[in-house]
Amino acid sequence: MSTTLIRGGRIVDPSQNIDRVGNLFLRNDRIEGIDTGATVADHVIDAAGMIVCPGLIDLHVSLREPGDEKDETIESGTAAALAGGMTSVACMPDTSPVVDNRAAAEFVQLQCARAGYCNVFPLGAVTKNHDGQELAEIGQLVEGGAVGFTDAKSPVANAEIMRRALEYTRMFGRPIFNHPQVPELTAKGIMHEGYYSMLLGLRGIPAGAEVIMVARDIALAEMTGGHIHLMTLSTAGAVDQIRRAKAKGLRVTSEVTPHHLALTDAALQNYETNFKVDPPLRTKEHIDALIEGLRDGTIDVISSDHQPFAEEKKQNELDSAPAGVVGLETLLPICIKTLIETGHLTWSKLIAKLTINPATILGIQKGTLKSGHDADITIIDPVTSWRIDPSKFKSKGRNTPFAGWEVKGRAHTVIVAGRVRHHA
């Protein structure tokens, strides 16, 4: 038996509407309670001046294993997650082979158990091999531990396939995660279609490519009663549609990334591949709409969309380099810089979008400091300044758009199942 007392921190738990200075007591791998009166423990952590919250959860992470271990492994990716303050991640099925059957899902869980850094919840494929033609073995994947279904960066373009997927996954109480882009409108596109795409002579991706797919998916969610989760929003039009869908009580949730909040399409002026992402960086008008969506609850979650690539892949020309950036180790400080320091969100609202909201979408018993729940805790130092240096990342990927940024705040201590697994 082991006990831990986290003393004197600002405890922020949106699941219980708690935001106050206090003590958190852990017994073995469970939370005993807040302000239990305990003053001694086997381990005491002084959290004065820090924020103590449920372990952060990232529901959009690509770990690359099996198949692309040169880009990332489960071990390096989960180590990066811990360094970023995450105690749980949901991993995309975009591996080789694709996680479209029970054996593949069980392999991912086995490898994650061996790595032993943080909790990993596998997402299964919607269609076999992500080809959009035939549904994957949904029932078998649920038995193999899949908490949701997605074809990752491959949008489910066929409306009939998506309809059947929503109907089927509803039976198992699982969400469908879709990348809301119309493939015909995004093919060979490099950046947001607008002033800078014309100035730079680069093929653009119109905002309408996202807006059209969001509208279709909302309509299918209404038709089927299924749960659609719309990944990595980037446009004002998508936010408007989701706001209306939520007002109607539809089962629609959504997410946004820190890089879509912090950067605009103007960043591509130097043809730097670490600003090439999918969906593309857009204009300030779209960013303002995304932030308002976070403020009013239209957007439920902030996720990293962690997309690690070996350095040589990102050294290609802009048109041939893969789209995507790493984000596990920069998510928290960029959120602090763009949302907390600017006054757009309170700490409680930000932490909700990183804890209880993703846990609720995934249907996992995480994201809370309630007594009896798993002792997954993130202790945040909100004030320490540091410079983002990709050479120090735990991730094998160095492809960040934030290299050299001066930021404040980072994960100070990360506890998984009652054990300290990371300490800055």
Where are these regions (language model features)?
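C-terminal cap of metal-dependent C-N hydrolases
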Residues: 317-320, 374-424
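N-terminal metal-binding scaffold of metallo-dependent hydrolase/deaminase domains
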Residues: 1-39
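Alpha-helix-loop-beta-strand connector modules within alpha/beta enzyme cores
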Residues: 102-119, 167-178, 330
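His/Asp/Glu-enriched, well-ordered alpha-helical/loop segment
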Residues: 199-227, 274, 295-296, 300-302, ...
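Divalent metal-coordination and catalytic microenvironments
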Residues: 9, 24, 29, 49, ...
